[in-house]
Amino acid sequence: MRTALSLTVFLCVAPLHAAEQKLVHEGVVDAPVDAVWKAFTTKEGIESWMVAKGEIELKIGGKMRSVYDAKAVLGGPQTIENTILSFEPGRMLSIKNTKAPEGFAHAEAIKNMWSVIYFDEAGPVRTRLRIVGLGFGEDEASQQLRKHFDWGNAYTLKKLQEHFAKQGK
């Protein structure tokens, strides 16, 4: 029988230097690391739980493009484009937004931000996922972006947990 979803959210802010500010979301997913890795790093994976349409080129400098609206055109104005900065297969993925969707309120602030996603075994069929957002400044625009990702990353983690919980039933 599957265990209940568990979600632990940690927020860490280093007040001394803007460069040290980070946003951390962490939780356990009821699936092995390999399955969670594929859910984040393959077209089939991201389209199964995260986005309506997507594509990913898993390589340094590769693009991860997606849209949330099934009616939107991938490559059109609503496309979100992230560039892969680095990765260690099955362990870590770092990305930076290189194209925000048209009308995104934080388009300037996001230029300084990047995310690192860690995948760690938390048991034979469980994965501890840790999403770290970095590059937030002390200015108002950057703090608004931070709030946006605080909600968004928590939501993303919850959706991933729900996706695998449904598969386990």
What are these regions (language model features)?
Residues 1-5:
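Positively charged n-region of N-terminal signal peptides that target proteins for export
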Residues 9-17:
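Hydrophobic h-region of N-terminal signal peptides that target proteins for export
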Residues 16-59:
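Hydrophobic ligand-binding cavity/cleft-lining segments
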Residues 25-27, 53, 79-86, 112-121:
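Hydrophobic/aromatic beta-strand elements that line small-molecule binding cavities or substrate pockets
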Residues 30-34, 58, 85-93, 118-128, ...:
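A short, structured loop/turn motif at beta-sheet edges
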Residues 36-37, 46, 64-66, 84, ...:
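Hydrophobic pocket/interface hotspot
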Residues 44-79, 87:
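Short beta-edge strand/loop motif at the mouth of beta-sheet-based domains
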Residues 104-151:
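Beta-strand/loop substructures that line and gate deep hydrophobic ligand-binding cavities in soluble
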